Amino acid sequence: MIKATDRKLVVGLEIGTAKVAALVGEVLPDGMVNIIGVGSCPSRGMDKGGVNDLESVVKCVQRAIDQAELMADCQISSVYLALSGKHISCQNEIGMVPISEEEVTQEDVENVVHTAKSVRVRDEHRVLHVIPQEYAIDYQEGIKNPVGLSGVRMQAKVHLITCHNDMAKNIVKAVERCGLKVDQLIFAGLASSYSVLTEDERELGVCVVDIGGGTMDIAVYTGGALRHTKVIPYAGNVVTSDIAYAFGTPPSDAEAIKVRHGCALGSIVGKDESVEVPSVGGRPPRSLQRQTLAEVIEPRYTELLNLVNEEILQLQEKLRQQGVKHHLAAGIVLTGGAAQIEGLAACAQRVFHTQVRIGAPLNITGLTDYAQEPYYSTAVGLLHYGKESHLNGEAEVEKRVTASVGSWIKRLNSWLRKEF
């Protein structure tokens, strides 16, 4: 058995309200992620992204990790962990520093980003991510990479994502109870955007919505930069609950009916299609028209998507007032387990009045039969995030080695000049 650290392996772990998913990916030389292990099990002990039964969560995590290890034939020691919940919040901040030399160095960039993130965040919150949006040097704005440019003062605009300390501690505790280390906590909506969006979509303006069981995670990009993140604490489980109450069926059966026979647009359902609905209390099952089922599902999905639309409209108005690109020319990308229902893209187009697609994970090879579903978007995004961290880490080591060799040569040259 190979240890996950012996090869360029990254492990993504998503502990959602509906499922726990673990993916093992190998980083290939061309930057692709080759998925070699998958583990998944229904989630217990989670509600809307928060832990409400630690022992149950630990058991679920252990089961998913065991499956992934068995399939990948490796020993997992650490994971990139997704985090969601209504305690996640965001803010856009600005930092400014004088440029130390004539040209901007990497150190200047790090300093200005550090200045931008050194702001007061909400009480009992910690910073999860600091994501640069763009830079300005003196009077030149909209710079993507300032290194090497000349100027006197540099400004950075950044997007901060924060989370509640205790919520983060609880989910990390569940993972550590399984003998695993958390490499990094990543906002689930950000991970999903790494997984399903293209560079063109980010540039044109796009909103990705990951619809899970307990939460909808939103990330909005315009001009290639992340402008807004949000968690709405209502999602697929609300639809399941509606089905259970409307037809008097157990929640587990309601979930199965939603997944197998659900449709978010009644007009595309055939009139003679029927569904068998289990009853409670030992009563015999009943037959139900699929059209009737769609009449319960469609209004609830429309309501959920309207919550997202309200968020987008408020953001666009704010960006417009700030003079920032606010059009979402690439439309909406829906992903996550609850985005797999039939008719959702057409239902969403009626709400958003723009193009909508269902997003599945991109740029992966290997066990794609398992992982190339919207269901795994967050977990695949964690692998992409981990891959970037791996590559950046290696680049930093190379940079430090080059710098130390360079300084050694400089010292040698100055000594030679002094001596001879």
Swiss-Prot record:
InterPro entries (alphabetical): ATPase_NBD, Cell_div_FtsA, FtsA/MreB, SHS2_FtsA
Cellular location of this protein? Cell inner membrane
Q: Would the keyword Chaperone turn up in this protein's UniProt record?
A: no
| One Pfam family in the UniProt entry | SHS2_FTSA
Q: Which domain of life is it from?
A: Bacteria
Q: Which Gene3D superfamilies does the UniProt record give?
A: 3.30.1490.110, 3.30.420.40
Q: Does the keyword Transmembrane helix apply?
A: no
Q: How does it sit in the membrane?
A: Peripheral membrane protein
Tell me the impact of changing residue 416 to E: Prevents localization to the Z ring. Lack of activity
Which keywords does this Swiss-Prot/TrEMBL entry list? Cell cycle, Cell division, Cell inner membrane, Cell membrane, Membrane
- A GO CC term? cell division site
* Subunit field text: Self-interacts. Interacts with FtsZ. This interaction plays an essential role in cell division. Interacts directly with the cytoplasmic region of FtsN.
- PANTHER family, from UniProt? CELL DIVISION PROTEIN FTSA, CELL DIVISION PROTEIN FTSA-RELATED
Q: What is known of its domains?
A: The extreme C-terminus is essential for localization to the membrane and the Z ring, self-interaction and activity.
Provide the function of this protein: Essential cell division protein that assists in the assembly of the Z ring. May serve as the principal membrane anchor for the Z ring. Also required for the recruitment to the septal ring of the downstream cell division proteins FtsK, FtsQ, FtsL, FtsI and FtsN. Binds ATP.
- The name this protein carries in UniProt is Cell division protein FtsA
Organism, as annotated? Escherichia coli (strain K12)
Q: Which gene encodes it?
A: ftsA
